[in-house]
From Swiss-Prot:
One of its GO terms (biological process) is hydrogen peroxide catabolic process. The keyword Protein biosynthesis does not apply. The modification N6-acetyllysine is found at residues 58, 81. SUPFAM superfamilies: Globin-like. Heme b binds at residues 62, 91. The modification Phosphoserine is found at residue 43. Red blood cells. Signal peptide: none annotated. It holds the Pfam family Globin. It comes from Bison bonasus. One of its GO terms (molecular function) is oxygen carrier activity. The lineage of its organism: Eukaryota, Metazoa, Chordata, Craniata, Vertebrata. This is Hemoglobin subunit beta. Involved in oxygen transport from the lung to the various peripheral tissues. Heterotetramer of two alpha chains and two beta chains.
Length: 145
């Protein structure tokens, strides 16, 4: 999946990411850009507008939780399936989340990283992160296969 050089680049960069801020924004953007994903978050209260979603404390908190799990995956890039096995089971068997949503969230995360880091998030780093988010999405979808 990733070369040693790519792993070093993404893990070094990830150390600069503020998971609370980036996670909340990424999940919020997912819910705004792909509104059908909101059905999994009905208990989060007001999701009636982009402003409501982006300022929703529960969205921000869950976004941080999502990126905390992603951070754990960044420590286990050689075993993403094992790292995300329990979350794959939860999202498949209990929450019935469409696995396509994992890909969407990964792509939104890449957009948010580019927005936050600008020129520092080079095209090469973006390509490396695209491999990571694809690997995480596949690991989360593993239970569905």
């Amino acid at each position: 999946m990733l070369t040693a050089e790519e792993k070093a680049a993404v893990t070094a960069f990830w150390g600069k990411v503020h998971v609370d801020e980036v996670g909340g924004e990424a999940l919020g953007r997912l819910l705004v850009v792909y509104p059908w994903t909101q059905r999994f978050f009905e208990s989060f209260g007001d999701l009636s507008s982009a402003d409501a979603v982006m300022n929703n404390a529960k969205v921000k908190a869950h976004g941080k939780k999502v990126l905390d799990s992603f951070s754990n995956g960044m420590k286990h890039l050689d075993d993403l399936k094992g790292t995300f096995a329990a979350l794959s089971e939860l999202h498949c068997d209990k929450l019935h989340v469409d696995p396509e949503n994992f890909k969407l969230l990964g792509n939104v995360l890449v957009v948010v990283l580019a927005r936050h880091f600008g020129k520092e998030f080079t095209p090469v780093l973006q390509a490396d992160f695209q491999k990571v988010v694809t690997g995480v999405a596949n690991a989360l979808a593993h239970r569905y296969h």
